[in-house]
């Protein structure tokens, strides 16, 4: 078989079985939207939880589609994940297993700290950094523009390392001005 440079690229990933239905959506609506917007085809193997994204048009749009699928797999609502089709938006997935010993309750504790009482901590970080955060399985994931994600990740790392919530809030409130200035400079350049 010839190796043609124009050959369509296929990206594969494993998605938790319970999230496959969300990727498909009601009457296939989510899958169809991702395929159309991402100029790709999506094949889902429900037995193995494998998802294949085949580039059909613009390779950057197909990569964005793969990030959308990954985000939905990491617990994001599809409407939130669609923001990854926006230029300069990214998904960062932080695995919590790296900071917790196997078999410990540390992951559960960290997830509780990130979410906060009735979702308060997550909401405050999202509001102050203009990002979206999902806590799912053994991961914490963030969607936002490059600048915003940087600040959200810093705040999350502070929480994960054991800093008090109020310390993280105070840090973020101090950094909000820096964040706005960085975004302004990014938009001007």
Stretches with model-predicted labels:
Residues 1-189:
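RNA-contacting regions in translation and RNA-metabolism proteins
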């Amino acid at each position: 078989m010839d190796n043609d440079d124009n050959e369509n690229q296929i990206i594969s990933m494993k998605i938790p079985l319970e999230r496959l239905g969300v990727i498909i959506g009601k009457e296939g609506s989510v899958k169809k939207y991702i395929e159309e917007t991402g100029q790709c085809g999506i094949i889902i193997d429900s037995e193995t939880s494998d998802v294949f994204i085949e580039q059909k048009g613009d390779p950057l749009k197909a990569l964005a589609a793969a990030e959308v699928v990954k985000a939905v797999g990491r617990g994001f609502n599809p409407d939130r994940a669609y923001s990854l089709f926006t230029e300069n938006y990214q998904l960062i997935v932080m695995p919590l297993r790296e900071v917790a010993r196997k078999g410990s309750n540390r992951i559960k504790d960290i997830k509780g700290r990130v979410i906060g009482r009735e979702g308060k901590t997550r909401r405050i970080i999202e509001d102050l950094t203009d990002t979206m955060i999902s806590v799912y399985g053994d991961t914490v994931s963030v969607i936002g523009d490059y600048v915003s994600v940087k600040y959200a990740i810093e705040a999350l790392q502070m929480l994960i390392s054991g800093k008090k919530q109020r310390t993280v809030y105070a840090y973020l409130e101090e950094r909000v001005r820096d964040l706005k200035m960085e975004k302004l400079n990014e938009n001007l350049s």
